[in-house]
């Protein structure tokens, strides 16, 4: 039996703030389902203040011990919970994890150094030393680095996944020993460009390196995408692979989704039309069944391609369309969408908020989903929109390239519309193509059906990870 420990700083449904939480909430369960009796998959994460009492009531205290982090001697409690066949461990320390948010504290470096040290220190007390420790992003990078520098368990292999190379865990060398409890000799391991870089350290130290889509694995070898780490990535390319994320197709299922007004299927789509009318009413837009809704559900930040949207928004709105925006982010984009909604009240609904229930209704009601990202390691929104029959229009980058294939009228293959060059008018041309397809009802029905039948399950990804673990 292969023993796997999945180390993460967040996981749904316990505590999450982004894509890593979705992955950590779904992949371990799928690994267990795919591996059956041949794998023992367990997950460890911090016990944040935001973990609900409902889950706390299901936990049992597994063990308590003291973690030595340089001169600090810190309490650690390990709580255990079993859910969907997977054992979850929660690292308890209120000083580090009883905060208002998961990240963004001045001492995040110390918090996650403690977490990483606690993970390795707990293995003997809980009686579970894994064959493979699978760490994720800079917050658990020190698990891999500590293991390499201290050789905790010689037989244990380490897999490290980069979910977004922009976040690297950079700190001053002044805290190498005082906070990270690393010897001076570790400077060569974690040092990069004049500072500590935890992501770089894990890349160098791990036995296998993965990222969240095959295309992103190729992209981060280039200077444009690698945020300075292209040399390190290329030096370690022999152990790099890209495995496309999936989505939770039970939660995101238009056939049985209690969070949308009307359920529907690829064969019986009438519920989607009803949802569209209800969404138009809810958002104060004219109820026009034949006017396509173009939706964006996104963080309103530059790398999501919003500068392209701002550049040609007026051109887009000259067509018979309605534009629905949901998200928060940089004030320049929030204000732009508020302004354009004021000027085009019958065409634009700008919802500057985070609302997962409204997001579901938008996915289930819209016709076209726009995702013109400058970079996108994997992306989940394009998969969710396709699942709900909202045809994605995406730029060919990262996971968007791997998951959305352009519709070909000659073969009737393809589940969306794509464009390659990061250019506002190339994006606009893709939108015009989508609108032309939309006006041809038999063609649009085929594209929508292809999108809804796309395989975005975690099962495929889980098998690739299991093969990776076996080959270490």
Please describe what each predicted stretch is.
Residues 1-472:
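Catalytic cores of nucleotide-sugar-dependent glycosyltransferases that transfer UDP/GDP/TDP-activated
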């Amino acid at each position: 039996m292969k023993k796997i420990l999945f180390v993460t700083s967040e996981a749904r449904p316990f505590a999450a703030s982004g894509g890593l939480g979705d992955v950590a909430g779904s992949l371990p369960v799928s690994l267990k389902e795919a591996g059956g009796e041949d794998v023992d998959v367990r997950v460890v994460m911090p016990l944040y203040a935001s973990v609900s009492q409902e889950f706390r009531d299901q936990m049992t205290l597994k063990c308590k011990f003291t973690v030595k982090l340089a001169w600090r001697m810190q309490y650690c409690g390990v709580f255990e919970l079993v859910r969907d066949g997977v054992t979850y461990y929660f690292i308890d320390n209120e000083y580090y994890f009883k905060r208002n948010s998961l990240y963004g504290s001045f001492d995040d470096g110390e918090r996650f150094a403690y977490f990483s040290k606690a993970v390795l220190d707990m293995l003997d007390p809980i009686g579970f030393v894994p064959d493979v420790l699978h760490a994720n992003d800079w917050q658990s990078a020190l698990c891999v680095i500590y293991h390499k520098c201290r050789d905790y368990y010689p037989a244990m292999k380490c897999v490290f996944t980069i979910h977004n190379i922009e976040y690297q865990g950079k700190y001053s060398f002044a805290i190498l020993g005082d906070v990270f409890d690393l010897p001076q000799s570790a400077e060569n391991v974690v040092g990069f460009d004049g500072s500590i870089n935890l992501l770089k350290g894990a890349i160098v130290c791990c036995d296998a390196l993965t990222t969240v889509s095959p295309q992103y694995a190729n992209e981060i070898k280039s200077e444009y995408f690698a945020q300075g780490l292209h040399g390190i990535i290329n030096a370690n390319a022999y152990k790099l692979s890209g495995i496309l994320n999936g989505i939770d197709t039970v939660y995101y299922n238009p056939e049985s989704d209690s969070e949308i007004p009307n359920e529907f299927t690829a064969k019986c789509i009438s519920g989607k039309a009803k949802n569209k009318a209800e969404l138009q009413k809810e958002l104060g837009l004219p109820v026009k069944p034949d006017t396509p809704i173009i939706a964006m559900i996104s963080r309103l930040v530059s790398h999501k391609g919003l500068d392209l949207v701002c550049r040609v928004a007026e051109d887009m709105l000259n067509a018979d369309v309605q534009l629905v925006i949901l998200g928060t982010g940089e004030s320049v984009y929030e204000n732009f969408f508020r302004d354009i909604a004021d000027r085009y009240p019958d065409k634009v609904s700008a919802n500057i908020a985070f609302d997962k229930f409204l997001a579901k209704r938008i996915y289930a009601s819209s016709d076209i989903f726009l995702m013109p990202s400058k970079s996108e390691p994997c992306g989940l929104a394009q998969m969710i929109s396709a699942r709900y029959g909202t045809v994605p229009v995406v730029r060919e980058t990262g996971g968007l390239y791997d998951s959305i294939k352009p519709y070909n009228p000659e073969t009737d293959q393809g589940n969306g519309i794509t464009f390659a060059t990061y250019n506002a008018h190339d994006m606009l041309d893709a939108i015009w193509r989508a609108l032309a397809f939309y006006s041809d009802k038999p063609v649009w029905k085929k594209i929508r059906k292809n999108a809804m039948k796309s395989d975005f399950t975690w099962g495929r990804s889980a098998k690739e990870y299991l093969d990776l673990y076996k080959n270490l």
